[in-house]
Amino acid sequence: MPIQDFIAKIAKGPKASKDLTWDESKQVMKLLIEGQATQAQIGAFLMAMRFKMESVSELAAFTAAARAYVAPLSIPKELAVVDVPCYAGKSETFHSVIAGAIVAV
């Protein structure tokens, strides 16, 4: 499926936009990583996802698809690493991850 079809599905406005399925999300990520979309299409897709708000399933599928293209990091066990998520600022929630990570380390 071309990226235009995915953009059309998620860019229909706040009430008509639909979440992508697991397979659709993986297909989109593959298109993006393999350079099969123009810069304008990538921008349109990312803006539509931002307005629609990504679902947990979509994010998990994007991550699963991207992992097929990236070698895992080799980090020594004695090194304390904290993976801090990015917050887009759209949600009005308390971000306890950073505070919890500081306490844990």
Annotate each PLM feature.
Residues 1-96, 104:
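Acidic, glycine/proline-rich low-complexity segments that act as flexible tails and inter-domain linkers
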